[in-house]
Amino acid sequence: MAKINDAWFTVEEINNETYAISEYGHWEKVHSFLLLGEKRAVLIDTGLGIDNIQRISKQLTSLPISVITTHVHWDHIGSHGAFDNIFVHKDEVDWLIHGIPKLSIEQIRMDVGRNITLPTPKTFNPSNYKPFQGQPSGVLEDGNVIDIGNRKLSILHTPGHSPGHISLLDHKYGYLFTGDLLYDQAPIYAFFPTTSPEDLVQSLEKIANLSSLTKIFGSHHTLGLDPSILLEVKKAVITLRENNLVRFGTGIHRFNGFSIQF
């Protein structure tokens, strides 16, 4: 890959068929992922929407791109409007079309506009920022398999952070893309009214039982975690349940390599 020098996005080659497109100039440190097959490509999320991620994806591939949405939070659907083929879990179709109930545009604009450390494009103005809303091209469910040509991706329904949150298992390379289910450096959030502590812990248990993983890619902060973190996830699940902590209001729980806030 020829090096892409971009003012906003950072492109990192994971392998010659997998790229991270990151937004390190924002406090969220968001990662989107472009996965190439022989017939088509998948873009896991489209970032913050501060700049148009399609400008980067076009430089990386000429394959037709399907956008797979880990969940319908504003920092993951920012450039959805630039793509024709958008897929979302069935439990968040309504959010994609109508927005998230009781999440004010004022709160979103405050969050998207704060703690920015890189120059933003002239087209970005937090005061008129609006998250994408629209109809998906297709609906995803747990167990769906997407074949992009000599590369199969399994959809895992992993709710908790949001009701229709999904993770993706890349069978070819053993990669697990966890969205906002698992990452480091900041708490995994399950304290909003639209979250579920019980579902989050069940989802963590679900991915902790996966085998033959080579790398875990969360959507924020450190790019690529060692699968050994799942041993700590298993311990965390037991600790949280045994101490009756899996409920709203119990605060931040810190473990080796990650933390969770209920």
Which stretches of residues belong to each language-model region?
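Basic/polar N-terminal segments that are highly enriched at the extreme N-terminus
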Residues: 1-7
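Conserved beta-strand hairpin/beta-sheet module of binuclear metal-dependent hydrolase folds
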Residues: 7-59, 167-184
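Short acidic-hydrophobic surface loop/beta-edge motif
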Residues: 10-14, 35, 143-148, 253
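Short Pro/Gly-enriched beta-strand edge/turn motifs at strand-loop
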Residues: 13-19, 124-128, 149-151
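Short glycine/proline-enriched coil/turn segments at helix->beta-strand junctions
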Residues: 37-38, 61-64, 80-86, 171-173, ...
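Metallo-beta-lactamase
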Residues: 41, 48-49, 138, 145, ...
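Active-site HxH/HxHxD metal-binding segment of metal-dependent hydrolases
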Residues: 50-145, 228-250
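C-terminal regulatory/interaction regions
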Residues: 246-262
